[in-house]
Amino acid sequence: MKPRNRFEKAVLAESKKLRPISKTQCKWAFRECIDHFAYRLPKGRTTCMDCGHSWTIEKPTDTCTCPHCGARLQVKGTFQRKIRQKQYFTILTACGEYQVLRMFLLSVEMEKGCKTSSYTFEIGQYWWNAQGRKTIIAVQRTLGRYIDTFSFCSPMAVRNDNEAYRHISYSPIYPKFKVTDTLRRNGFEDNFHNIVPTELIPALLSDSRVETLLKSGQIPLLKFFMHNGRRSIDSYWASIRICLRNGYHIEDGSLWCDMVDMLNQLGKDIHNAKYVCPTDLRAAHDHYQTKRRARQERENIIKKRKEAMEAEQAYKQLKAKFFGIEFTDGIIRIHVLESVQEHLEEGTAMHHCVYDAHYYSKPQSLIFSATKDGERIETIEVSLETMKVVQSRGVCNKNTEYHEQILALMQKNMRMIEQRATA
């Protein structure tokens, strides 16, 4: 793709000035980015796949050191003679005023008795100017089953960013960095803190808030925002400034942001150090979570009561002829629920869905409550179509020791319910 503006033209020109990858960098990639094996035969003859040297290991083992090249190897019992490995790696460097992340493919071929042959191929480069503006110089990506299929014969040119280049940018990075003065000034100290370079570098160059978090050592909070989108930082920045002003270190970014959200919902002052700088973050988080849950429960009860009042008239028109039905065997008393409010109270006390599932609005269902000594024991649903008990549930939908007795009492008095239905 041809460069479309001055920025892309300047970057393309600068990319031609980059030095080839050094032998030291290639050696690091070979040593750190791929697996190293010793192939062992059943009788103990072992071959280092790095240098081709053979020796005998009497007893099976998981790892060993090659006596010839000193490589630390994983011992693998196999008759295989060849192995091929590929791995991406990256190098952070600077070119003129630009920060550059170079991406390489390391391809290694190993064969028994031979020294390893390897080569590196440059896939592409991420370029950023001092303001964090980005462009990509890379080989062309081709269509295929895998995201990282490239046309290695294509020229290095300006490309659109895509998942293939982003995928490679997550690869291991050479530990010796060369950075621009601007990036160094903005707080970068040769540590990405497990944040992808393609996310941290442009953020650090373009967003002063990221610079502030990095310089103040608020790394857990910085990682949280980088992993969850920097847009959300706006909602918390005023509270973050309170923490910075009071020298408060946020040990868990996710937990702290959750706590601030809960404080906001509870109507607390999130600009007050008393709330946003707790001595024990986890204890404070759990405390406000409990308070928010209690508030939500109160709001739900109010909402349900309002719904019950609105549904009350319709329920009376639908089931009024059954009101007053009550029977007992001397131990258990069973009566029909005569209002939506009673359905709400029954569902709350018994911890089931008789109210939430709107049983009061079902024209062919009639709900009864079974009690013993004034305490609820089971809730019964009767079908007005079949005049049979559909279900009878105790607390948390479990059957009680009185379950069969309740069913027998319901069956004995089903004629009374049927008479009311036909009246």
Model-derived features: positions:
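Catalytic-core elements of nucleic-acid end-processing and repair enzymes
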Residues: 209-210, 214-423
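Sequence-structural signature of the catalytic-core scaffold of metal-dependent phosphohydrolases
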Residues: 1-312
